[in-house]
Amino acid sequence: GYILSSAVEKMTDAQMRAWNAAPQVVVTSFWAFVYEKPDAKSLRVSDVVAACRLKLLGKDKQFYHVALPDGREGYLPMVHALPLEKWRKTVKHDAQSIIATALSLSGVTYHWGGTSVKAVDCSGLVRTVLLMHDITLPRNASQQAKVGEHIEIAPDFSNLQPGDLVFFGRKATDEKPAHVSHVGIYMGNQKFIHSLAWVHVSSFNPADPEYDEYDLNRLLWAQRILPQLNTIPEVKTNDNVEFYNVK
């Protein structure tokens, strides 16, 4: 496929090593702006979203002096970010914390290809939420469906755990294999959160007001990923991801 050249910044290995070795801050607010000066009334250089990592050049008043990967510099209000190592000490990897983050995105609109708090598709929601917890996993639902421990879902859902990923799509037939086209995060009590039109909670239980018959009928299986964190190549905290550790 193709991407706008202005949307990426090419780097050599040496440049990537320098970027990774530099002090960084992580955006902790849903979104914020980088300004030309340490003054929120000055012109904006760029917007940034949750989990963005920026090079830390210094501090000025209540602002971080930061650099973007393309070399632009500006000032980010400190209230919207934390130094990388300090942020890592605050991040949790348990299911309930991850579900709470997913719920905080409730109402965010669906956008195909979206991978930020501005808009997300189904797998983009999963990836964005986990990135906000310093975890990287594959981008697309069809890729995520191959990661972790495969779970054939019991009729009463009793073998599912909060934090499992639940997958939907076309069921397998004698002629064709199953085709994954949707994913959500299981919350427990037969409920899951996903991005379909917008981010919201649905239920497999016909007695619940959030009952989702459409998705129940196309439910395929689940994948358990959190116990496999940093034990399999596809699910890692970012301090173990090769991209952030170019040698």
Q: Which ranges hold each PLM region?
A:
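Short, basic/aromatic beta-hairpin or loop at an interaction surface
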Residues: 19-35, 131-146
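Sec/Tat-exported extracytoplasmic proteins
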Residues: 38, 105-110, 129-137, 170, ...
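Second-shell loop/turn segments in exported
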Residues: 85-89, 109-117, 170-173
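Active-site nucleophilic cysteine motif
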Residues: 102, 114-133
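Short, flexible active-site loops
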Residues: 103-114, 144
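...with weaker cross-activation on analogous glycine-rich loops/strands in unrelated enzymes
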Residues: 137-201, 207
